[in-house]
Amino acid sequence: MTDTGTLFLNQQDVIDAGAADVDWVGAVLEQVFKLHEEQAFTAPPSSFLKRPECPHVADRIIGLSAHVGAPFDREGMKWIASSHINPEHGLPRANAVIILNDPVHRLPIAIMEGALISAMRTAVVQALAARYLARPDSESVGLVGAGRIGALTLWAISKWFPDIQHYRAFDQNAGRLQAFVEHMGTLDITVEPVPCFQDALSEADMGIVATTESEPYVTASEFKRGALFMNVSLMDPTFELVSAADKIVVDDWHQSVHSDRVLARMHREGLVTRDSIHGEFGAVVSGHIPGREDPDERIFWNPFGLAIEDIAVASAVYDQALSKGLGKTLRLVDQEWDVLF
């Protein structure tokens, strides 16, 4: 292999390559979950940089690396940083960079803006989960957390569930909630702002939490019969809510219980085991276990978020960028350093 350089893709390049297309990203992610079920990937535990003087659960940097098998056959890392105070300063809560390497020579073939890929795969995974786990006749969606992930998630769901009648949202910041409602209106999604999280979730066929809360507060009273509860964020649901579920579905069992999120805490206390959950989502997508079987069952969906999702989407973006002539080629090395000695 000849070193052809490293393709640099900024956010607009990533968008132009297809990463903002819900259907395109969804097709990639469906493949990813089938590969996960086949164990056609390698993904070590995430690396967390967490400083003791910054105790908030959202204040950290995470390195997620993975190799994803064919048809992608690429490896790489997402380096994603987050600060819970950023929105107060007009900055995005999270930012990310993704590096792709070829799987044989390990040369860096691409460096790309990763926040959009990270946000889109997070949102589209929820829409994909809804396809398999929500009632097909769902009419209402409730959201807690009027941020970018929440907006993208509602947008993705609206693409695949056009018959949704009611969207309700709550956020502790009234100004942010109003801005969220106005923004969603520009996307032809009418969102009703509500005064408390209970009003957003208690009657929702799909309940979504996408916040940076560090303590649980959502109870089983906000998890109605027949609902799908999507635990997109960190610590919002109580043990009681999780225990009320008829089925618990995770993206990856090992990752889910080796964290500090609600399911991991329940596992450490012996309240949730591998045998007590319904299974991993890849098994559902592959048809090895059923998704929703009963219109009245309550399903708790716990997506940890997987590096293979990021690397697969980034790999597909890279291929599209090459075919469309997007980005700029960088030369990281003009000559090997050892020629200097």
Q: Which ranges hold each PLM region?
A:
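Short helix-loop-beta connector
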Residues: 133-140, 163, 224-225
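Glycine-rich Rossmann-fold phosphate-binding loop(s) that bind the pyrophosphate
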Residues: 146-147
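NAD(P)-binding Rossmann-fold cofactor-contacting core
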Residues: 160-185
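Adenosine-phosphate binding glycine-rich loop
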Residues: 13-19, 242-340
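Rossmann-like adenosine-cofactor binding region
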Residues: 187-271
